[in-house]
């Protein structure tokens, strides 16, 4: 989207986006750090799906580490003072880690689908070494598919602008290519995940008709709902705003362009939300993760009570 001279500044939107990115960073780092600890110290049996989940954790942590810089960018009124190269590197890291996370979410869904719906396929006999090999290929593939030309910034009189979440101007062929890649990286995984999960639910309903096995079906349904909610909440708004960008890109009205930029900022910040929601998927994948998160929550509650107890005793002594 071509940027014009009309100002698109909105303190409310910039503060909201900056605050949201800060929360996503904190929650994403905490949730995925606990998951990483669980992988190293609590998970006793590693299977291919665990390898894919581990790579998802790494991708989410990588995404969370880039968010503080963009949060500061928005909280400072879209003023970027770190220079051209850091802008390029961080934008690449943001797009790359986000794409890797989506790829491993899709891989986990496909792995569960094949193991439950088609258990006799030879692909289900993959070794851990093969799973690590597939994971390495996914990382390399996403390096190639991450649009390099997105990572551009433009110098202004007072600061350097680092466009974060909306398409930038450039050659038409290059811009079209990066948009096609974006839609493929979102819509193709969403369609594949929806297909795999619907087939998984149908198969479980046929096989687990006994009343004592219904909790497994309910558990699977909840997991499917979480994954679909994750995609719908995180990526659907961004897809819609990208469509609006192409519909209204010929409009010269400043108000229209301002609205598109603000909508793109909000929708773009939502695409990073999946790193904070992924721990819910870990909990449904293995009880070890549920135990770790409960242990952390109990520890935090215990510290809060310990911090509140001195004031309570002081108040009681003077009553």
Curated annotation (Swiss-Prot):
Query: What's the chief localization of this chain?
Result: membrane
Q: Which GO CC terms are listed, alphabetically?
A: plasma membrane
Compartments, as annotated in UniProt: Cell membrane
Q: Which residues are glycosylated?
A: 5
Ranges facing Extracellular side: 1-16, 74-91, 153-180, 241-265
Q: Which residues lie on this side of the membrane: Cytoplasmic?
A: 38-52, 111-131, 202-219, 285-319
Give the protein's function.
High-affinity receptor for 12-(S)-hydroxy-5,8,10,14-eicosatetraenoic acid (12-S-HETE), with much lower affinities for other HETE isomers. 12-S-HETE is a eicosanoid, a 12-lipoxygenase (ALOX12) metabolite of arachidonic acid, involved in many physiologic and pathologic processes, such as cell growth, adhesion, inflammation and cancer promotion. 12-S-HETE-binding leads to activation of ERK1/2 (MAPK3/MAPK1), MEK, and NF-kappa-B pathways and leads to cell growth.
The protein's name is 12-(S)-hydroxy-5,8,10,14-eicosatetraenoic acid receptor
Q: Which organism is it from?
A: Mus musculus
């Amino acid at each position: 989207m071509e940027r014009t001279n009309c100002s698109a500044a909105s303190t409310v939107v910039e503060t909201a986006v900056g605050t949201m990115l800060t929360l996503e960073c904190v929650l994403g780092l905490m949730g995925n750090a606990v998951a990483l600890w669980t992988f190293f110290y609590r998970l006793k049996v590693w299977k291919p799906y665990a390898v894919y989940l581990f790579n998802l954790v790494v991708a989410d942590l990588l995404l969370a580490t880039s968010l503080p810089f963009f949060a500061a960018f928005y909280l400072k009124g879209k003023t970027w003072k770190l220079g051209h190269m850091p802008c390029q590197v961080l934008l690449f890291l943001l797009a790359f880690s986000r794409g890797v996370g989506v790829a491993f979410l899709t891989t986990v869904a496909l792995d569960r689908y094949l193991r439950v719906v088609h258990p006799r396929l030879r692909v289900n006999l993959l070794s851990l070494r093969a799973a690590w090999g597939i994971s390495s290929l996914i990382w390399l593939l996403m390096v190639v598919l991450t649009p390099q030309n997105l990572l551009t910034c433009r110098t202004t009189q007072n600061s350097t602008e680092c466009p974060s979440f909306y398409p930038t101007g450039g050659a038409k062929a290059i811009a079209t290519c990066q948009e096609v890649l974006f839609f493929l990286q979102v819509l193709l995984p969403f369609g594949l995940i929806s297909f795999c999960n619907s087939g998984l639910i149908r198969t479980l309903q046929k096989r687990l008709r006994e009343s004592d096995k219904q909790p497994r079906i309910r558990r699977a349904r909840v997991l499917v709902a979480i994954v679909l909610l994750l995609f719908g909440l995180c990526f659907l708004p961004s897809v819609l705003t990208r469509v609006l960008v192409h519909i209204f890109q010929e409009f010269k009205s400043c108000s229209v362009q301002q609205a598109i930029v603000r909508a793109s900022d909000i929708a773009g910040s939502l695409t990073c939300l999946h790193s904070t929601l992924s721990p819910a998927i870990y909990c449904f994948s293995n009880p070890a993760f549920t135990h770790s998160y409960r242990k952390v929550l109990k520890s935090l509650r215990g510290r809060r009570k310990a911090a509140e107890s001195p004031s309570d005793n002081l108040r009681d002594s003077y009553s």
